[in-house]
C-alpha cells in the first residue's frame, strides 16, 4: 500500500444527506456508505450527525479490509468524534489503525486557536478549521482542510464538474459532481439538488478506484 493510497484512505477515513438515511429525530441523521475497491466490497463508513443547542456533533466510523486471495492484505479502522459550532471545528478526538500504524488526534478550540495534539505532539492551528466534512456542502468553499487522521492541514482545490445522473435510493437522480484535488488526492464527489452527499470516488494511485455508495 503506497503513500498515496494511505493518504486517500486516511482523508476518506475522516471521512463523513438526508434522503434515504435512517432518521431517529428531526435533529439526528445516520449516513451509511458501502465502500468498494474497484468492484470488490471492502467495508463500510458510517456517520452519525446530531444537531443541538451546542452545535453539531459528528461520529464517524470506518472499517476496511482488503483481501488478497485468502489473506487480509490491508486493514483500516478509524473513529472520529467531532463537535462543530458556526461552521468551525470546536473539538475533535480521533483514533486510527492504518494497517498497524496508530494515530491519535485530539483538539479543542480555545479563544483564537485550535489546540491540537497528534500522537502526543502539540500544535496550534487557526481557530476556524474544517475537516474533510463531506456531509456539509459548505466545506467545499474551504481552501484548507484538516486531515482528522494525521492532524495535517491540506491545501485543496475544488472544481465543479457539472451535472450527472446517479443511482440513489433505488432510482436515478440528478447529481452535481465536484472534483477535489491536493498533492496526493484526487477525489470526485456527488451531491443531489438538495445538497445531499450520495457518492465518492478516489484514485488510489495504483490503478485502483476507491468508491463510496450511499446505502
Residues covered by each model-derived region:
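Long, intrinsically disordered, low-complexity accessory segments associated with secretion
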Residues: 3, 17, 23-24, 150
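Bacterial N-terminal signal peptides
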Residues: 10-19
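Bacterial N-terminal signal peptides that target proteins for export
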Residues: 1-11
Amino acid at each position: 500500500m503506497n503513500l498515496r493510497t494511505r493518504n486517500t484512505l486516511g482523508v476518506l477515513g475522516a471521512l463523513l444527506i438526508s434522503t434515504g438515511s435512517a432518521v431517529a429525530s428531526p435533529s439526528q441523521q445516520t449516513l451509511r456508505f458501502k465502500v468498494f475497491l474497484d468492484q470488490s466490497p471492502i467495508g463500510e463508513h458510517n456517520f452519525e450527525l446530531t444537531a443541538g443547542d451546542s452545535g453539531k456533533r459528528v461520529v464517524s466510523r470506518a472499517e476496511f479490509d482488503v483481501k488478497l486471495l485468502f489473506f487480509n492484505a490491508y486493514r483500516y479502522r478509524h473513529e472520529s468524534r467531532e463537535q462543530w459550532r458556526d461552521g468551525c471545528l470546536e473539538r475533535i478526538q480521533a483514533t486510527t489503525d492504518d494497517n498497524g500504524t496508530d494515530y491519535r488526534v485530539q483538539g479543542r478550540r480555545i479563544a483564537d486557536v485550535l489546540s491540537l495534539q497528534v500522537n502526543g505532539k502539540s500544535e496550534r492551528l487557526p481557530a476556524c478549521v474544517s475537516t474533510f466534512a463531506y456531509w456539509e456542502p459548505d466545506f467545499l468553499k474551504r481552501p484548507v482542510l484538516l486531515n482528522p487522521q494525521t492532524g495535517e492541514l491540506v491545501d485543496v482545490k475544488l472544481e465543479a464538474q457539472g451535472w450527472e445522473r446517479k443511482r440513489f435510493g433505488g432510482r436515478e437522480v440528478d447529481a452535481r459532481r465536484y472534483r477535489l484535488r491536493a498533492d496526493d488526492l484526487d477525489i470526485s464527489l456527488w451531491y443531489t439538488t438538495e445538497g445531499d452527499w450520495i457518492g465518492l470516488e478516489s484514485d488510489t494511485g495504483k490503478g485502483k478506484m476507491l468508491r463510496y455508495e450511499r446505502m
